[in-house]
Amino acid sequence: MHTDTTFDLWVLTGKHWREDLLNIAHIYFPQTKGRKVTLRLETTDQDGCPRFHTDRTHLRLLCTYLGPGTEWLRNDQANREAQLAGAPNSEILLADKPSQLGRFWVGLLKGSAFPGNSLNGLIHRSPPSQGPGVNRVLFCLDS
């Protein structure tokens, strides 16, 4: 992980960042089949969604520009019954460590509203907070 904050600030300013957001959106929008899309661009040093969950969306696009990326589980790592029952993460994660999106990676997550996917949305969570003042910048598109 690159820790030079000067580099981080350069990446997050100006023309290059705007172009990247637009390029990602242009790839995402055709996948939505004309559905309404909501956009979030957030900066936080807090825990977002600490519990492993699935989204009640069609498709969610995530890209972390600063800080740790979204954690996710393969189907063979997850106890879906525990997840649906609201059990704690320790009962949902069956084996290994969660996979994690890297910084600048684009994740396209099928939610439970995706056709034929009602009980098979990607199980994921926000990464644990790195502490006060250690920010995460996340771009999210939902349909």
Segments (PLM) and residue ranges:
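Signature of the catalytic double-stranded beta-helix
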Residues: M1-T43
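Short linear motifs at secondary-structure transitions and domain/linker junctions
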Residues: T13-R18, R35-L41, D47-G48, E81-G86, ...
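Active-site environment of non-heme Fe oxygenases that use a 2-His-1-carboxylate facial triad
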Residues: L22, L41-T43, R51-F52, Y65-N75, ...
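A generic structural signal for short, solvent-exposed coil/turn residues
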Residues: Q31-K33, R56, S118, G131
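Extracellular structured ligand-interaction cores
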Residues: K36-T38, H58-L61, G67, R136-L138
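Catalytic core of non-heme Fe(II) oxygenases with the double-stranded beta-helix
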Residues: Q46-W105
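Catalytic core of Fe(II)/2-oxoglutarate
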Residues: E91-S143
